[in-house]
Each structure stands twice: as structure tokens, then as C-alpha cells.
UniProtKB/Swiss-Prot annotation:
Segments of this protein annotated with the region Enoyl-CoA hydratase/isomerase: 1-189
Name of this protein: Fatty acid oxidation complex subunit alpha
Organism annotation: Vibrio parahaemolyticus serotype O3:K6 (strain RIMD 2210633)
EC number(s) on file: 4.2.1.17, 5.1.2.3, 5.3.3.8, 1.1.1.35
Keyword annotations from UniProtKB, A to Z: Fatty acid metabolism, Isomerase, Lipid degradation, Lipid metabolism, Lyase, Multifunctional enzyme, NAD, Oxidoreductase
Catalytic reactions of this protein: a (3S)-3-hydroxyacyl-CoA + NAD(+) = a 3-oxoacyl-CoA + NADH + H(+); a (3S)-3-hydroxyacyl-CoA = a (2E)-enoyl-CoA + H2O; a 4-saturated-(3S)-3-hydroxyacyl-CoA = a (3E)-enoyl-CoA + H2O; (3S)-3-hydroxybutanoyl-CoA = (3R)-3-hydroxybutanoyl-CoA
Binding-site residues, substrate: D296, N501, Y661
UniProt site (Important for catalytic activity): E119, E139
Residue sites binding NAD(+) per the record: M325, D344, V401, V402, E403, K408, S430, N454
Recorded superkingdom: Bacteria
Matching Pfam families: 3HCDH, 3HCDH_N, ECH_1
Length: 723
């Protein structure tokens, strides 16, 4: 043994050839701080090892290295610029040491080789993988960019254009693609991988492969003419500006880094990479996006605990109510390996549900994500039925009939009589209280809400709603089932609107009040999209949700929270509803809609909306962008905080993920609680006070007032790794 540490070891495997194996005692290998320090010492040991002829990098896991340890990021980013720069110099000195070994080196890859793992293997002379290999640099998705030499080495290995595509998109390449662009030198069968790598390394040792020329290419400036350079980087900047936009600076910063470093040799180019990495790491966007990743891991951890605590797994499910929503739920369940009975009282609805599932599967088939055999198997695992026969075999029932409390209560009571005592029954509802529906059941402890978002196959969030009598066992089983479906389940307590709709309607309330006071709804949409970062402004979102749906939900919320959400007279939503302008569904709402060549609705502003709004809107008034943002966001933020204060949602992490996954809250802002920490709670309280005369929606919850007085934050030292 040449060197041994907790997460890696080095041994000589045959005359002069050493193997450095990453072998973390955990389930995956990560390039955490401890592993980096061990790698540094291992390379020192190799440098002083007599008779060294070549080095292989291997992993004892199904994945080579999944990346750096993201739990350590926020702690690192909290360092001063100088401290972070110094740490990056140390980290890069390790990979330089690997690259500068006086012998040929090869990385033997299988499974994921991502982020820091990819940057590590770029420092070796050769890379060989099997068909399971996936290699790439996802850092820009976290608001940063490669900082271990990825922006320097990758363009020199595969060319600037391919490198910029991978880095700016945060892309991972499959083995065949990586081979095609030169990121891998060979792809072989898994059984032959180790031996093939050994043979390749031996060929390099025997000078049959010019490994020194490869190394020189990586440590020299990029070979681009002035014209090539101008074309590559100008085009890349244009594409990135179009796709990433101004709220996500990491992709553009990566392009600038590669461009500026192109004319320098390795060490000078690494200095440039380090400078820009520090700038990104200190940004609010990086803090928010890394925080979201950690929050997502937190949600997944809760789901894993639920699955372990549940007395049984969901092996079969049933959906009551077909159509597009029921078909979407059935599709998602079957896709993830849980056969489902889809029951409805009308054959046309069953046909629509099966058509929806078939349409979604055909899309996957066209994208090459499944083959015909797999598609047929998934479709066959959805059983449409007009009867309850066979439903007794289901572990979980999802009721998804029309949003009517009497109809739902009847269906729930009926299905309970057809299933066993340990069958869990759930209701997919967005507005009807779970405690009310539970009254129709003999076993309310086996019942909870399971609120899917539309379209089911795209929206990651599922709200799991706990009623007063819902048992922990029921919650655990439903959370585990939602996770099995590939969703992100978040448990909330029952209240009008649950969590997501409850916090959405004060936002719509703020919008209605802006229109009442003379704001132009098209300007409000532009500000909330372009400046704040929502995927849709409030008027456009209302059109997509459906004005009729919003009108009904608004009435439910007004009844549930009359002080904050009760209305004084008619508003814009009422006016459109009364004019039968329901939004996209009937082609007219705030905007008018036509179908484009791709079959998608295209919105345009037409003046026929103005008379409809005339009696609920004041004469046109100009509002600056900050006022629009404040008047739109303060009501939502206050309601989110009240939900935490009242225990409707358990943690800031779950609230922020629900907002991003369920409403499209701008990811670069990290959710309401991350946003509050970024703005400063005391600053937010003062800002809200300036709008207090607008009504109760703008009155700050006591929790925020108390936290502001104590100088507290929601995340604080949380998610900060110990450095």
C-alpha cells in the first residue's frame, strides 16, 4: 500500500503501475474537503514512490465521483474573497499535481462522473468508460461554474464550442456522446473496462500513445484564430443571453472566463477562472440555488424516512375519476412501476384518461426515453374500469373526481365500502377542506389530501394534506407513494387553500388592488416576469389557471380568511368572470389567445378587455417597478410567514420548495424565506409598513416583527457546512 485514507487508497497493482481508488465508506464518492486533502497527500506519496511508471484512477462504487460535497458549499461561500481564493488555489494545486505527474495517467469511469469528479479526471491524460458512464459539469445549475479547472481544461480537450455547451447548460453527456466529442477516449463493456484501461495505460507507458502531447495541449493556450475566437464566443454569448437571461449570471460568466483564459497557458487561465468563481460564489443567486439543492435533499430525506416508517409499500394503486387529471395521475403511477386501476362512471372519460396516458408515453417514445416494448408494458399496467371490481387489491386510492364537496363525499364513502381496513384513501382537491371530506368516512385516520398540480407529469410538487384525524401511518404511506411516483411530497396541515393556493391568492389580491388603483396589467406582468423573475405575470397566470377556477377559489379563500382575503366590492377577476372571459380555456381573458403552428396558445393584448375592466379599475396611473413588486409580493410573503407561524407548514425549507415546485417562484431567489434573508427581515418589515394603509394583507405577521427585533434570519447558520 502506497497510501491509505478514509475515502481513497493507493496501491501498486503491477510493476510500476499504481491504482488510486476512491472508496468512501458512504454510498457514493464525493470530492469533499477531507477527500481533497487526502488526494493531495496521496499524490505526494506517488511523486516520491520509486519506479512509478503509470497511474490509474478508479472507484469502488457504481458511480465514479458524483461531484463535490454541496453541503459544504455555503460554508465555503461565506468565507472572505481572499480566503475563498486561497482555498481554490490549494484545490487547484492538487489537480495540477495530478496533471504534472511524470508518468501517464488514466481515469477508469463508470456511472456518474460529475462536477468536481469530471474536473478531476480532466487532469488525467486519458479517460475510458463503460456504457453507464455519464460525465459533465452541472455547476451552472447551482449559480456557480466549474472552479477546479473545468473552464480551463475542458475547452482544451474537446474544443471551446462543445465545452461552452456543456458548461453553460450544466449538461451531463452519455458515454456515446462523450466518446464522439473526445471527452472519453474509449467506451467498452463493463466486464472489460479495467483490463482495457490497463492495456491503454501500458501502451502509453510503452510510448505507443503520445500522452505527453495530450498533456501539452491541456496546459497550453487554446489554438483558436482571431476569427474563430470571435465567432465562437460571440455566438455563445448570444445564445446564453437568450436562454439564461439576466437573473442567472453563471452561464455568461463561464463563457467570459473561457474567452479570457483562451490565450493563456494553464496557470494564468486558472487565475482567471478563480477570479470569476469567487465572484459567482459570493452572489445571492448562488446562495439561493445551492440552498434550493440542499432543501431538495432535505425533502427527499423526509420521504425516505417516511418510506422506512410505513408498515407497507404501495404496490398497487387506484384512481377514481379519469379524464386528463386522472389519466395524468394514472400515467405517472404506472410510469414509475405502480400498476393502477382507473375507475370512472363514464366510458368517454375513461377513453380520455387512457388517451392522455398514451399521448404522454408516445412523447417519451419519440424522445427515445422508452422503447415500444416498455411503452406497451406501462400502458398495460393501467386498467380502465366502469366498476369497483379489483379495487380491493389497491394499497392507495386517489380520488380525483369533480371539485364538488357533495360528489367527492359520496364517492369517498362508496369506495371505502369496497376496500380493506388498511387501505389508504386520498383526495386530489385544491379547495375542499380535508376535515370536511373526512366526515363522510368511517375510517378518517386512513384518509388525507393528495393535491397534484397540473400538468401532473411536469409539476414536481404534491401537497400531502393532514386532517385532524389522519394517522402518521397514512401520511408515511402517502408520502412514500408520492416519492415513488417521482414527485416531491410536502406535508401540510388542513386549512382553506392548504399551503400553495392559500399563499397564491393574496398575491392575486395585491394584483387586483393595483388594477383598482389604475395600474396597467400588461406592465405589471412585464415587471413581475422580467424584473422579479416569475415565469408568468399575474394576469397571464390567471388566464392559464382559468378565471372561473380562480373566481371559485377566491370565494373559498375569502370565506376562510375574511380579514385578509375578504373583498370590498367587485374586482378584475369578478369582471372577467361575469363577461365569460375565462382565459386560455375559451380564448379570452386578460389576453386573447390563438393557437400557433405547434398547437400551443399564443397570447396577444387586445383593447376589447378595457371596457370589461373599466368599472373595476381607476383611471390609468403610473407605478414604478419597485412599487409594483412590493405591492405584489408583500401579501404573498406575509401569508407564507403566517403559514409557518400557524404550523400549516413545518419548516422554511419545505415552504420554499413548495413555492418553487408548485408556483414557479423564481429559483434564483430561493423561495420566500431565502428571499427574506437576502432582503433582510428588518428591511422587509419597514418596507411593508409603508403599504400598511392598503389593508390587512399588508400587515406584517408577529413572527417577522419579533425576528427583526432580534436580528434573526430563517436560514442563519443552517446549511452551512463545518469548514
Amino acid at each position: 500500500m502506497i497510501y491509505q485514507a478514509d475515502t481513497l487508497q493507493v496501491k501498486e497493482i503491477q510493476d510500476g503501475i499504481a491504482e488510486l481508488s476512491f472508496c468512501s465508506p458512504k454510498s457514493v464518492n464525493k470530492l469533499d474537503l477531507a477527500t481533497l486533502e487526502s488526494l493531495d497527500k496521496a499524490l505526494d506519496a506517488l511523486t516520491s514512490h520509486q519506479g512509478l511508471k503509470g497511474l490509474m484512477l478508479t472507484s469502488d462504487k457504481d458511480a465514479f465521483i458524483v461531484g463535490a460535497d454541496i453541503t459544504e458549499f455555503l460554508g465555503l461561500f461565506a468565507k472572505t474573497d481572499a480566503e475563498l481564493d486561497q482555498w481554490l488555489q490549494f484545490a487547484n494545486s492538487i489537480f495540477n499535481k495530478l496533471e504534472d505527474l511524470p508518468v501517464p495517467t488514466i481515469s477508469v469511469l463508470k456511472g456518474h462522473t460529475l462536477g468536481g469528479g469530471c474536473e478531476c479526471v480532466l487532469a488525467t491524460d486519458m479517460r475510458i468508460g463503460d456504457k453507464t458512464t455519464s460525465i459533465g459539469l452541472p455547476e451552472t445549475k447551482l449559480g456557480i461554474m466549474p472552479g477546479f479547472g473545468g473552464c480551463v481544461r475542458l475547452p482544451r480537450v474537446i474544443g471551446a464550442d462543445s465545452a461552452m455547451e456543456i458548461i453553460t447548460q450544466g449538461k451531463a453527456c452519455r458515454a456515446d456522446e462523450a466518446l464522439k466529442i473526445g471527452l472519453l477516449d474509449a467506451v467498452v463493456e463493463t466486464d472489460a473496462l479495467y483490463e482495457s484501461a490497463l492495456q491503454t495505460l501500458t501502451s502509453a507507458i510503452n510510448e505507443k500513445i503520445d500522452w505527453q502531447a495530450r498533456r501539452k495541449q491541456k496546459t497550453s493556450p487554446l489554438t483558436l484564430s482571431k476569427l474563430e475566437s470571435m465567432m465562437s464566443f460571440t455566438m455563445a454569448k448570444g445564445l446564453v443571453a437568450q436562454v439564461a437571461g439576466p437573473h442567472y449570471p453563471a452561464p455568461m460568466t463561464a463563457v467570459i472566463t473561457i474567452e479570457e483564459g483562451a490565450r493563456f497557458a494553464r496557470n494564468e487561465a486558472l487565475d482567471i477562472e478563480r477570479k470569476y468563481f469567487v465572484k459567482l460564489a459570493k452572489s445571492e443567486e448562488a446562495k439561493a440555488l445551492v440552498g434550493l439543492f440542499l432543501n431538495d435533499q432535505y425533502i427527499k430525506g423526509i420521504a425516505k424516512k417516511a418510506a422506512k416508517s410505513a408498515s407497507k409499500d404501495t404496490e398497487r394503486a387506484a384512481v377514481l375519476g379519469a379524464g386528463i387529471m386522472g389519466g395524468g395521475i394514472a400515467y405517472q403511477s404506472a410510469l414509475k412501476g405502480v400498476p393502477v386501476l382507473m375507475k370512472d362512471i363514464a366510458q368517454p372519460s375513461l377513453d380520455l384518461g387512457m388517451t392522455e396516458a398514451s399521448k404522454l408515453l408516445n412523447k417519451r417514445l419519440a424522445q427515445g426515453r422508452i422503447d415500444g416494448f416498455k411503452m406497451a408494458g406501462i400502458l398495460a399496467s393501467i386498467t380502465p374500469s366502469l366498476h369497483y371490481a379489483g379495487i380491493e387489491n389497491s394499497d392507495v386510492i386517489v380520488e380525483a373526481v369533480v371539485e364538488n364537496p357533495k360528489v367527492k363525499a359520496t364517492v369517498l364513502s362508496e369506495v371505502e365500502s369496497h376496500v380493506g381496513e388498511d387501505t389508504v384513501i386520498t383526495s386530489n382537491t385544491s379547495t375542499i377542506p380535508i376535515n370536511l371530506l373526512a366526515q363522510s368516512l368511517k375510517r378518517p385516520e386512513n384518509f388525507c389530501g393528495m393535491h397534484f398540480f397540473n400538468p401532473v407529469h411536469r409539476m414536481p410538487l404534491v401537497e400531502i394534506i393532514r386532517g385532524e384525524k389522519t394517522s402518521d401511518e397514512t401520511i408515511n404511506r402517502v408520502v412514500a407513494y408520492a416519492a415513488k411516483m417521482g414527485k416531491s411530497p410536502i406535508v401540510v396541515n388542513d386549512c382553506p387553500g392548504f399551503f400553495v393556493n392559500r399563499v397564491l391568492f393574496p398575491y392575486f389580491g395585491g394584483f387586483s388592488m393595483l388594477l383598482r388603483d389604475g395600474a396597467d396589467f400588461t406592465k405589471v406582468d412585464k415587471v413581475m416576469e422580467r424584473k422579479f423573475g416569475w415565469p408568468m405575470g399575474p394576469a397571464y397566470l390567471l388566464d392559464v389557471v382559468g378565471i372561473d377556477t380562480a373566481h371559485h377559489a377566491q370565494a373559498v379563500m375569502a370565506e376562510g380568511f375574511p380579514e385578509r382575503m375578504g373583498k370590498q366590492g367587485r374586482d378584475a377577476i369578478d369582471a372577467l368572470f361575469e363577461a365569460n372571459k375565462y382565459g386560455q380555456k375559451n380564448g379570452n381573458g386578460f389576453y386573447s389567445y390563438t393557437i400557433d403552428k405547434k398547437g400551443k396558445p399564443k397570447k396577444t393584448f387586445t383593447e376589447d378587455i378595457l371596457p370589461v375592466l373599466a368599472d373595476v379599475c381607476a383611471d390609468k396611473q403610473e407605478f414604478d417597478e419597485q412599487t409594483i413588486i412590493q405591492r405584489m409580493m408583500i401579501p404573498m410573503i406575509n401569508e407564507v410567514v403566517l403559514c409557518l407561524q400557524e404550523g400549516i407548514i413545518a419548516t422554511p425549507q419545505e415552504a420554499d420548495m413548495a413555492l418553487v415546485y408548485g408556483l414557479g417562484f423564481p429559483p434564483f431567489r430561493g423561495g420566500v424565506f431565502r428571499y427574506l434573508d437576502s432582503v433582510g427581515i428588518a428591511e422587509f418589515v419597514e418596507m411593508a409598513k409603508q403599504h400598511a394603509d392598503l389593508g390587512a394583507m399588508y400587515h406584517v405577521p408577529q413572527m417577522l416583527i419579533d425576528m427583526a427585533a432580534k436580528g434573526e434570519s430563517f436560514y442563519g447558520a443552517q446549511q452551512q457546512g463545518s469548514i
